[in-house]
């Protein structure tokens, strides 16, 4: 899985601080400046920050809730859980700080791309659950789609992003159902 790849890549890093980005993710000058300050001060072991999911060519509304990610961390304090086949994140033993800066993720250029990713990730996630002997629940299958839609569309305020927010919320609900 991806966790093993990321653990191996981290072992090859020659610097203490590791920035974990995918090929479709881009930093801006403001977040880079924040990283430099945090590294200079050296009072944290990891940094959590916001992600702009650029969907069909546009960033989400400023009123929509953005996901946050732990992507900058000290190599000596971090590891990955190799049983995670998808949505892996570093596990850091130390002080975490949050900065109110964001990076852009260009992974969802069209509805077909987001659908393909939902199918790919849900297959990996269901394999992961199978390997851990997790059983499915009929009640959960019945409830997960509508509850995920309510959470993403209303509580995460995706409705502020118009049709893109509606499509994104439906895709998130579909993913939650199929995994």
Name each region found by the language model:
Residues 21-23, 30:
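Active-site acidic Asp-centered loop
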Residues 1, 25:
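Alpha/beta-hydrolase active-site loop signature
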Residues 18:
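Short aromatic/hydrophobic "clamp" motif used to bind/position activated sugar donors
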């Amino acid at each position: 899985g991806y966790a093993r790849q990321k653990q191996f890549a981290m072992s090859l890093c020659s610097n203490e601080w590791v920035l974990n980005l995918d090929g479709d993710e881009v930093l801006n000058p403001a977040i880079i400046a924040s990283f430099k300050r945090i590294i200079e001060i050296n009072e944290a072991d990891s940094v959590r920050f916001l992600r702009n999911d650029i969907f069909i060519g546009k960033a989400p509304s400023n009123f929509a809730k953005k996901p946050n990610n732990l992507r900058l961390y000290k190599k000596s304090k971090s590891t990955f859980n190799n049983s995670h086949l998808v949505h892996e994140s570093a596990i850091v033993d130390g002080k975490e700080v949050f900065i109110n800066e964001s990076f852009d993720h260009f992974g969802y250029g069209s509805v077909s791309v987001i659908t393909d990713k939902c199918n790919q990730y849900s297959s990996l996630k269901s394999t992961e659950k199978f390997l851990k002997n997790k059983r499915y629940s009929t009640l959960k299958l019945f409830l997960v789609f509508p509850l995920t839609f309510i959470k993403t569309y209303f509580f995460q305020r995706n409705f502020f992003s118009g049709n893109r927010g509606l499509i994104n919320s439906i895709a998130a609900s579909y993913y939650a159902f199929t995994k």
